[in-house]
Amino acid sequence: MKKQTIFLAFLALAALVSCSKEPKVENVIYLIGDGMGLGSISSLVLSEDGATGFEMGDPVIGFSETCSANNYVTDSPAGGTALATGTRTKNGYLGVDPDGNQLKSIMKDAQEMGMKSAIVVNTVLTEATPASFYGGVLSRSQGYDLAKQFTTSGVDVAIGSGLSVFINRPDSVDLTETLINDGYDVYLDWRSVVNTTSDKFVGILPMGDVHRRNKSTNTTAGAADGAEVCLAAKLAASAQEENIKEGYLSEPDQYLCKATAKAIETLER
């Protein structure tokens, strides 16, 4: 397999930064966990007898001050912006500095260096933390704006949820068509994501498939809006039995493993 330079921004329910002793870093995997401080990680390590991948201090461990530019307690947009850009901003601000100026993320820097990039999340692709790597808004509630900004993110692979802001929009623009016109393959079900040989794709899946908290056996309830309800119902009716039979994803607890593996496989081509 031909080795290529890779940058992966995986936003998931985990937290780990891997450092290499090699003089040249070729691959970077940046995992950001929601609420996974030392207390949570230590409890996990103890309960699993250390076999977690979160071995403390191996090879190094660091600390950072997390307060935002205007509050001792940060929020997701400001926290994500700090992680993505290295700049402290106001609570609520996402991808912009305290004066509202667009910031450049480390993913953008990596892309400019010729690196490939991917975002994998167990939430919507326009959630505050992943959006901090490609977007710039004054409020995390600007999901429609973030979806539009995502289409120009330059990311090679993205897998997550949140179809509604891409297709059920006030401007009546179908952003999945925009992505397709820009050379992406767009998939709305796991079967297609698992089987694709595309080098550039976006998977926008039902929320129940990517996060157990949102898993529901009732496909007419619990989704963000009608668009995702309809999609979830159609997918569940047509694919669930066959997917389980053939070993495809059937539960959210399998999502991160399979989505991460697929992204790495794609970027390594």
What are the roles of these predicted feature ranges?
Residues 6-11:
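Sec-dependent N-terminal signal peptides
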Residues 242-243, 268-269:
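Hard-cation-handling environments
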Residues 21-169, 173-195, 199-200, 217-224, ...:
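N-terminal catalytic scaffold of extracellular/periplasmic and nuclease hydrolases
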